[in-house]
Amino acid sequence: MPALKDTAFFKELTKRKSDNATIYAGKLLEISDDVGSFLEYTKTTFPDYPDHGIQHSCRILNYVARVIGTQICSLSDTEIFCFVLAALFHDTGMSLVGFAAKNTMRSKHPVNAAVAIDEYFNKALFTLKNKERIKTIVTYICKAHGLDLDAMYKDPEFYVVDTINGDNVRNSILSVF
């Protein structure tokens, strides 16, 4: 059973000796436990749907790491943090009990994930430096999960580049994973 600490993204982050990497790695372990519990509700809402718990997020991270190979080293600490957060949160829109009709929840879950992300950031990550900017990026990456390439290329958010905690963060790179 894959665990966050066993993913290439988490290992890459923990290899780095920067303050950002240390802070982000610690936060990710806490967040993965919280999100893992929340994602269990997907099984209740969609009992016939394949498992989309925390292991699914870890499988995605491992798959993307295999695809990008050594290019993982060119990602900034903050890019890794944002991408891992998006992998953890991308299916939370399917766990929002009473949020939407079941038949539309699945198709809209990439956008609906913003509700879970917003609530989690406000309640559990209120001390995170540059919280709002990181939340915006994670929300966009999750939204991009439901877009085709043409729609992404037409979206101005796709082209956003930010510098957060001294790190470049490129939506275009993170959203196409």
PLM regions with names:
Residues 1-99, 105:
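Acidic/His-rich, divalent-metal-binding segments that scaffold phosphate/diphosphate chemistry
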Residues 53-56, 109, 138, 173:
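Amphipathic alpha-helix face/heptad-repeat signature
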Residues 60-67, 106-123:
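An active-site-proximal "capping" alpha-helix that borders the catalytic cofactor pocket
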Residues 91, 96, 117-124, 146:
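A generic secondary-structure signal for well-formed alpha-helical elements
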Residues 122-177:
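Histidine/acidic-rich helix-loop-helix segments that form or flank divalent-metal centers
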